[in-house]
Amino acid sequence: MNNQVKQHAYQAIKNAKLVSVPFPHIYVEKVLPDEFYSELLDKLPPDNDYDIYPAPYEQRHYIQLSPSRTAKLTEAVSQFWKEFEAWIHSQEFLEVLVEKFGKRLQVNYKYREKDLVKNAVSDECVRVSPRSLLVRDYQNFALGPHTDSESKFIVGAFYFPKDDSLRDFGTSIYTPKDPAVTSWPSPHMKHEDFNRVKTFENRPNTMLVFMKTDHSWHGVERKQHSNVGRDVLFWIPQIGAAAGAEIPLQLPKRWFSKPSFIDRLTTKIGV
């Protein structure tokens, strides 16, 4: 992977404004250099390279990116995705995103305490499994509000449209109509029980990244879209082992440790 591409992306992520409400997130524009983004669009795999989720999510086609899986892609695109997968699953890429959210990650310590012990690789570090899904969603795809699975801590969505024709086929964030509703395990809820705060549009060369919490409610609105397919790459590192993750990474436990009183206070007020 070209170092210029990496540095462009890292700078775009660092410059993105971190918003704390309703949960920590960033929306990055022009995350990749224009020329590289055009090449990426040309290298999107053909439909027959994708697997299909079982009902009721059969409108989502996917490729779980890993060294062994990218090797099986159509020859014309395989090398590109092999290099891209190696980059976004690198220690370097992981650390850029973790540093962006920083001590905010500690607010979930009460949920993660046992997992940090179970997945420790040393007294100081915990195992992290890099994992990504390249998906193609078709016209009737929708997802009810959910907070995401328990082993995740940061979730990224690279949007790869060719133009703005599917811009409303984005990711929405929500708050529950009952403010007391939170959920760490993350069942999929009904849209009608939530207020939509904002929809992050499916625009070319953008990326939404958010922090998993017990109130990181997000989903996809029910709408009738054209059936050309929405191309998105979900970057979803997980604490511990994960299916399909072939090269484990690690992070210092301090990123997830019990926050001090001052840390809790500054995080609460959005410092």
Say what each PLM segment does.
Residues M1-V21, K253-V271:
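Fe(II)/2-oxoglutarate
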Residues V5, N15-L18, F23, V135, ...:
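Short, functionally important structural connectors and interaction interfaces within domains
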Residues Q7, S38, L116:
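Aromatic-glycine hotspot motif
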Residues H8-A12, S68-R69, A120-S122:
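Short, flexible segments with low predicted structural confidence
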Residues N15-N108:
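Non-heme Fe(II)/2-oxoglutarate
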Residues Q59-L65, L116-R127, K253-I262:
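Amphipathic alpha-helical surface "interface" segments used
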Residues A86, L94-P248:
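Catalytic core of non-heme Fe(II) oxygenases with the double-stranded beta-helix
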